[in-house]
From Swiss-Prot:
It comes from Pseudoalteromonas translucida (strain TAC 125). Residues 1-16 have a biased composition (Basic residues). This is Large ribosomal subunit protein bL32. GO terms for cellular component: large ribosomal subunit. The keyword Ribosomal protein applies. GO terms for biological process: translation. The gene is rpmF.
Length: 56
C-alpha cells in the first residue's frame, strides 16, 4: 500500500483540486426556431444544424 512521506498542506490540496469544478452544459440557440439547446444535440422539435433530422 502506498504511504505518503509527508502530509500535504491545505494549500497543496486546494491547488490539486482547482481543476475539479464542474461546469454547466454549453448551450446554443437553434438557427431555425430560436430554441435553446445543448451543443451537438438535436433540439426537442427534431432539428440539428438547421436541418430537420427527426420527423414527428
Amino acid at each position: 500500500m502506498a504511504v505518503q512521506k509527508s502530509k500535504k498542506s491545505r494549500a497543496r490540496r486546494g491547488m490539486r483540486r482547482s481543476h475539479d469544478a464542474i461546469s454547466g452544459p454549453s448551450l446554443t440557440v437553434d438557427q431555425t426556431s430560436g430554441e435553446t439547446h445543448r451543443r451537438h444535440h438535436v433540439t426537442a422539435d427534431g432539428y440539428y444544424k438547421g436541418v430537420q433530422v427527426i420527423s414527428k
